[in-house]
Amino acid sequence: MEVCLPNGHQIVDLINNAFEGRVSIYSAQEGWDKTISAQPDMMVCGGAVVCMHCLGVVGSLQRKLKHLPHHRCNQQIRHQDYVDVQFADRVTAHWKRGMLSFVAQMHAMMNDVSPEDLDRVRTEGGSLVELNWLQVDPNSMFRSIHSSWTDPLQVVDDLDTKLDQYWTALNLMIDSSDLVPNFMMRDPSHAFNGVRLEGDARQTQFSRTFDSRSSLEWGVMVYDYSELEHDPSKGRAYRKELVTPARDFGHFGLSHYSRATTPILGKMPAVFSGMLTGNCKMYPFIKGTAKLKTVRKLVDSVNHAWGVEKIRYALGPGGMTGWYDRTMQQAPIVLTPAALTMFSDTTKFGDLDYPVMIGDPMILG
């Protein structure tokens, strides 16, 4: 399972896309380069060399640093300073069992897809497989609002191993078939870059439709591709629903939260960084004025190159400033059994009004 770090890759991809790969990036494994696959450590921004872990200035562009210098940085905090975000065992167990039921069934359905059906969806769009919530394990908390953390748990041997195997296999199936699931977005920027637009509509002219329950609070974006805009001048419309941490799954920090690999089960984040093991590491926040100034430069340059609307769609409300506030300035909080009292009584674990699907949203003609 991935270690919980601020998503440097996401920001590097964003900047590289905006500047067409002309931004110099540094990694310990590969040194300075314009295209890097390893964990990024430094990048050039606004005449300065910036640490990708804390967005602090570590030198000037002319200096061309050969390694990431030591500075007050989240990446260089001692191991004993890490904070464990620990989830109560029963909560983790419920999540895992519900998720296993879901991914195992979706995996089985994908296995039964014929090449003819796959070709049809690729050319005509639409849904390839659908899983109705009623098919999920009836003992799962995701089935009904009446389920609770204290409901009996089904015993599953090697639960972690099975969940990891099914989850990995399902991801490989989706990737190899070049399909789009409506229950996760591996990279939020794919809402633009991974979906083809009709006509000559510019990506920055994306039309959007919002669910009436949405708010400006940041949360998980669930994209439903079933509603499409056919006007070529407007591009494609999405119905978006926001799942907010305070309202839907308790008040705890989101700097450990990975939007990029998060499937949603009935408005609950079923799997995210560290979730399969029940805990993840979070770095304490260290604030610095140089870092804040650098962020402003970064925001201005990327907004200018990519457009505010596209940035906002890729990184959520608040754009890059909001992303920075959420990932870099989030105080570590431990979720304990006592903290479960913050879970709302009205949380609905399986009350989605549409099934989860895997398919291609593109419709020709």
From Swiss-Prot:
Q: Which InterPro entries match?
A: Reo_capsid_sigma3 (IPR000153), Reovirus_capsid_sigma-3_dom_sf (IPR023634)
Keyword Transcription regulation among record annotations: yes
| Family assignment from sequence similarity | Belongs to the orthoreovirus sigma-3 protein family.
Q: How does it assemble?
A: Heterohexamer of three sigma-3 and three Mu-1 proteins. The RNA-binding form is probably a homodimer.
One Pfam family in the UniProt entry? Reovirus_cap
Q: Name one GO molecular function term.
A: protein serine/threonine kinase inhibitor activity
Q: Where are the zinc fingers (CCHC-type)?
A: 51-73
* Protein's cellular compartments: Virion
* Protein name per Swiss-Prot or TrEMBL: Outer capsid protein sigma-3
Arranged from A to Z, the UniProt key words for this protein are: Capsid protein, Host-virus interaction, Inhibition of host innate immune response by virus, Inhibition of host interferon signaling pathway by virus, Inhibition of host PKR by virus, Interferon antiviral system evasion, Metal-binding, Outer capsid protein, RNA-binding, Transcription, Transcription regulation, Translation regulation, Viral immunoevasion, Virion, Zinc, Zinc-finger
Single biological process term from Gene Ontology: viral life cycle
Chief place where the protein resides: virion
Source organism per entry reads: Reovirus type 1 (strain Lang) (T1L)
Its post-translational modification remark reads:
Cleaved during virus the endosomal proteolytic disassembly of the outer capsid.
Task: Supply the SUPFAM superfamilies for this chain.
Answer: Outer capsid protein sigma 3
Q: Which GO terms describe its cellular component?
A: viral outer capsid
What is the stated purpose of this protein? Stimulates translation by blocking the activation of the dsRNA-dependent protein kinase EIF2AK2/PKR, thereby inhibiting the host interferon response. Sigma3 prevents the activation of EIF2AK2 by competing with the kinase for dsRNA-binding. The viral outer shell polypeptides, of which sigma-3 is one, impose structural constraints that prevent elongation of nascent transcripts by the RNA-dependent RNA polymerase lambda-3.
